[in-house]
């Protein structure tokens, strides 16, 4: 069974946490992780691109010249695609790029990235993150006490940590999520994971 050190908010060590190998100790599947990251990045795209076809471009209501007798090719509108200032043919329309992968694939990707962080020593467990009020400075002290210098993803329990979330929201390089909301993209993008002990239990309940 994999084990990680358990720390207190002040940075002192409180013991060790034994992790479930079926969640935090599997052989990472890089191909599945790649597929899920691409899927989640696609879901983030706005997809608000749009073009104007000949019916949407302003003007062009009058026939530029008569149908016959001029020697020139017949034209019905100056907003036809072949005209300068005319409409666009087969241009982009607003759309959603989101698509879903099977649940088992997403879960395997989550277990793979969690296992990678544990193997690399980049998962830090903390017994609790309790704050009497939302204070950014207090959360910054926790980050400093745990010697976290680069981008960190803080994983909180699913409920009851509103002050911790509000305290971390304004810190640079700190992103906060919950046990059920942590995404593969968030975990891969973070240099380290700071996970509350009760959140570890909730993660294992879902993925084991």
Swiss-Prot record:
It comes from the Bacteria. InterPro entries: Ribosomal_uL4, Ribosomal_uL4-like, Ribosomal_uL4_dom_sf. Gene3D superfamilies: 3.40.1370.10. Residues 45-89 are annotated as: Disordered. Keywords: Ribonucleoprotein, Ribosomal protein, RNA-binding, rRNA-binding. GO terms for biological process: translation. One of the primary rRNA binding proteins, this protein initially binds near the 5'-end of the 23S rRNA. It is important during the early stages of 50S assembly. It makes multiple contacts with different domains of the 23S rRNA in the assembled 50S subunit and ribosome. PANTHER family: 50S RIBOSOMAL PROTEIN L4, LARGE RIBOSOMAL SUBUNIT PROTEIN UL4M. Part of the 50S ribosomal subunit. This is Large ribosomal subunit protein uL4. It comes from Lactococcus lactis subsp. cremoris (strain SK11).
């Amino acid at each position: 069974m994999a084990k990680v050190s358990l720390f207190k908010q002040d940075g002192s060590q409180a013991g060790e946490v034994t992790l479930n190998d079926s969640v935090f100790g599997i052989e990472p599947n890089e191909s599945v992780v790649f597929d899920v990251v691409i899927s989640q990045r696609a879901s983030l795209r706005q997809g608000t691109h749009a073009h104007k076809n000949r019916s949407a471009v302003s003007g062009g209501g009058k026939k530029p010249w008569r149908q016959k007798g001029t020697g020139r090719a017949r034209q019905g509108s100056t907003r036809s695609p072949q005209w300068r200032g005319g409409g666009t043919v087969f241009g982009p329309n607003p759309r959603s790029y989101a698509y879903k992968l099977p649940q088992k694939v997403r879960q395997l990707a989550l277990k793979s990235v969690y296992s990678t962080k544990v193997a690399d020593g980049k998962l830090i467990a903390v017994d609790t993150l309790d704050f009497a009020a939302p204070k950014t400075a207090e959360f910054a002290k926790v980050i400093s006490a745990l010697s976290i210098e680069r981008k960190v993803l803080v994983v909180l329990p699913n409920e009851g940590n509103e002050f911790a979330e509000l305290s971390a929201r304004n810190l640079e390089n700190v992103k906060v999520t919950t046990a059920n909301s942590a995404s593969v993209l968030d975990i891969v993008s973070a240099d380290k994971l700071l996970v509350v002990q009760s959140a570890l239990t909730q993660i294992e309940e879902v993925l084991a």
